[in-house]
């Protein structure tokens, strides 16, 4: 659906230049929700705006539905932009127009007959669950309702792709939940490809099929959302994941961990176990005690939801005779769970 090849974007002013996108390569599949996350200034907004050529790339190419959009002239671009809609953080509704008129605007610009406009607008109002708000003005709506109107307007011309530029950043938690649920419905019912940028990892884990993490203009990491959350590779990815799910060892414990199991007498492993799906049904901690005469004391445990998957994350201190806990680690490494040895600590130091 979307292919980005060797994309670069450079801003030049006088004798200075600022490279904000550096050799971006990625492919977004038709019908998926693809997240792009990064800190402020990482380049994510510039990348999104290149996808509808609001920003002209300095180099590289972008293909959408097998069309090289970077080669289009102004007239061709106007036609192409009907296929790629966009919603924004601050809604961009016209305060002088009511809800009906805001949604109708792109249809009016295309010269659609009034009878067809009326039918289409009310279809969209039903779709975004605002059937009784046609005559309301933006100032009479909540933030979540305004974003729903913006989404309806974006869908007026039946686009193939919806670009979302921090669409939930200005919303309260309840409205954010409603907008994300709506985007998932639109994705499934309309087969709509959605590309969203955000700085909120919670948004990514709730609705994105895959995610790319951008750092300093480059893709630091990319993959399926569940894989990225459970096994982040890049430091910037780990920092984002830690803001969304509780994978980080508490600082007061981390300070006590040793890298070497033989640093002191009676030093035992502190491990992180991650379960998801049916894996969480296995009585692994009980098995450690039963089979190896070792004890797994839970330091911290959390249940998370990532892409509709239940994920359990437990940090445990495994104590006992050295042969026992070494055998327990070998046992865990052969089970269908993610095992990470975080360090070693004495029994009385945790």
From Swiss-Prot:
Protein keywords: Amino-acid transport, ATP-binding, Cell inner membrane, Cell membrane, Membrane, Nucleotide-binding, Translocase, Transport
Gene Ontology annotations for the cellular component aspect, listed alphabetically: plasma membrane
Catalytic activities: L-methionine(out) + ATP + H2O = L-methionine(in) + ADP + phosphate + H(+); D-methionine(out) + ATP + H2O = D-methionine(in) + ADP + phosphate + H(+)
Residue stretches making up the ABC transporter domain: 2-241
EC class of the enzyme, as a word: translocase
Membrane-topology annotation of the record: Peripheral membrane protein
Any one GO molecular-function label of the UniProt entry: ATP hydrolysis activity
Similarity remark: Belongs to the ABC transporter superfamily. Methionine importer (TC 3.A.1.24) family.
Record text on subunit structure and interactions: The complex is composed of two ATP-binding proteins (MetN), two transmembrane proteins (MetI) and a solute-binding protein (MetQ).
The protein, known as: Methionine import ATP-binding protein MetN
Species: Francisella tularensis subsp. tularensis (strain SCHU S4 / Schu 4)
């Amino acid at each position: 659906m979307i292919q980005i090849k060797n994309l670069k974007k450079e801003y030049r002013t006088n004798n200075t230049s600022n490279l904000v996108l550096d050799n971006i390569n990625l492919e977004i599949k038709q019908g998926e929700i693809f997240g792009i996350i990064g800190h402020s200034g990482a380049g994510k907004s510039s990348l999104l705006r290149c996808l509808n050529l609001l920003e002209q790339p300095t180099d590289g190419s972008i293909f959408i539905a097998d069309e090289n959009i970077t080669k289009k002239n102004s007239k061709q671009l106007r036609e192409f932009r009907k296929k790629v809609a966009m919603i924004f953080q601050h809604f961009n509704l016209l305060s002088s127009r009511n809800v009906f008129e805001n949604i109708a605007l792109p249809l009016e610009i295309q010269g659609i007959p009034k009878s067809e406009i009326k039918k289409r607008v009310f279809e969209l109002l039903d779709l975004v669950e605002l059937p009784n708000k046609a005559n309301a003005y933006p100032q009479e709506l909540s933030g979540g309702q305004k974003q729903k109107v913006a989404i309806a307007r974006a869908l007026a011309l039946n686009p193939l792709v919806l670009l979302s530029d921090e669409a939930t950043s200005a919303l309260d938690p309840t409205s954010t939940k409603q907008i994300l649920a709506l985007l998932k419905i639109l994705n499934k019912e309309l087969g709509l490809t959605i590309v969203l940028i955000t700085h909120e990892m919670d948004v990514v884990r709730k609705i994105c099929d895959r995610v790319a993490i951008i750092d300093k203009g480059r893709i630091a990491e990319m993959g399926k959302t569940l894989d990225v959350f459970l096994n982040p590779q890049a430091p910037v990815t780990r920092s984002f994941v830690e803001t969304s799910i509780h994978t980080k060892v508490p600082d007061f414990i981390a300070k006590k961990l040793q890298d070497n199991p033989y640093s002191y007498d009676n030093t035992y492993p502190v491990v992180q176990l991650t379960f998801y799906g049916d894996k969480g049904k296995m009585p692994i901690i009980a098995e450690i005690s039963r089979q190896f005469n070792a004890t797994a004391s839970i330091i911290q445990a959390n249940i998370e939801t990532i892409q509709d998957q239940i994920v359990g994350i437990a940090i445990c201190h495994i104590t006992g005779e050295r042969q026992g806990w070494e055998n327990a680690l070998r046992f865990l490494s052969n089970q269908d769970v993610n095992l990470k040895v975080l360090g070693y600590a004495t029994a009385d130091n945790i």
